[in-house]
């Protein structure tokens, strides 16, 4: 036991230096402002008050939450059928399909998002195709639609993999038992398959929604600076404006929102696990 504690000590020190201290520093910056010659700073909540009393920042926060929700819903609607199909395939085909889904993830996300600029531009493949079928002068790049496409493209694999993991662990004898009891395919899916896959669905929702809320380079590249999300505001406060205190306050607010969402996800996972055990 003592040896294990000694082996864990370097990881504990690393976690404190790389995770805990930066978070504490951000919290500290969020509650201070410039002082006088005697006391260089003073405690204040003015940065939080500024955020919650400025309608522009609240609008951007709402926009970030809404587009993250849209991304999550689309990823779920697309990801579940794909994961279900993969789980129904034989092992060799499953491995091939999982490889094809994860293959783009081996490339840096920034590079993948940049590639969509060429696809969605006015001279790109998608706009040219839309022109051929009668939709002329369509502007996709630097719009909300472009940002949504980029979000779905980058985060869809996380949804698929989580749901596939739950479906692949499912006991197929339960489906056979449902069929023996007279349930048709639709009834079997909604009463057996879907409830048992809920842990994967909940995990997938978390892995898509949380990074979507705080994403900054996807809206920056595909939104062209015309579609700001809360991640862009934080980046702007730290790098461009130089208001580290206000940027830290926004970061803390987003972190608290994410912690709340994670608590809800954990609660949903426990509820799903209880239902699965009862099944």
Predicted segments — roles?
Residues 1-26, 95, 255:
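N-terminal signal-anchor/first transmembrane alpha helix
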Residues 36, 45, 113-152, 186, ...:
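Membrane-interfacial helix termini and adjacent extracytoplasmic/periplasmic loops
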Residues 55-88:
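Transmembrane alpha-helix signature in integral membrane proteins
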Residues 20-55, 123, 224, 279:
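Short membrane-interfacial helix/loop motifs at transmembrane-helix boundaries
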Residues 9-21, 99, 103, 153, ...:
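Transmembrane alpha-helices
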Residues 1-3, 48-56, 212, 216, ...:
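Interhelical loop and adjacent transmembrane-helix boundary motif
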Residues 22-29, 34-35, 111, 159-160, ...:
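Non-cytoplasmic
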Residues 6-8, 164-179, 248-279:
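C-terminal transmembrane helix and the adjacent membrane-cytosol boundary/short C-terminal tail
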């Amino acid at each position: 036991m003592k040896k294990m504690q000694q082996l864990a000590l370097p990881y504990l020190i690393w976690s404190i230096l790389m995770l805990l201290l930066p978070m504490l520093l951000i919290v500290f910056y969020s509650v201070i402002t410039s002082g006088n010659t005697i006391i260089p700073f003073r405690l204040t909540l003015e940065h939080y008050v500024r955020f919650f009393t400025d309608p522009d920042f609240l609008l951007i926060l709402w926009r970030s939450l809404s587009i993250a929700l849209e991304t999550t819903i689309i990823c779920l609607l697309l990801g579940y059928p794909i994961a279900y199909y993969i789980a129904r395939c034989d092992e060799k085909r499953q491995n091939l399909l999982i490889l094809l889904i994860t293959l783009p993830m081996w490339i840096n996300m920034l590079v993948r998002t940049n590639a969509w600029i060429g696809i969605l531009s006015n001279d790109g493949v998608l706009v040219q195709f839309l022109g051929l079928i009668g939709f002329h002068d369509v502007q996709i790049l630097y719009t909300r639609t472009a940002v949504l496409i980029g979000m779905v493209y980058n985060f869809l694999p996380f949804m698929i993999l989580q749901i596939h993991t739950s479906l692949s662990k499912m006991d197929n004898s339960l489906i056979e038992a449902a069929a023996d009891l007279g349930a048709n395919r639709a009834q079997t899916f909604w009463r057996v398959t879907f409830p048992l896959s809920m842990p994967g669905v909940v995990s997938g929702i978390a892995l898509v929604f949380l990074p979507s809320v705080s994403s900054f380079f996807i809206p920056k590249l595909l939104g062209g600076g015309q579609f700001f999300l809360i991640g862009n505001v934080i980046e702007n406060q730290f790098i461009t404006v130089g208001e580290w205190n206000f940027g830290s306050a926004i970061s803390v607010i987003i972190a608290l929102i994410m912690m709340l969402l994670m608590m809800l996800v954990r609660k949903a996972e426990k509820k799903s696990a209880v239902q699965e055990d009862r099944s």
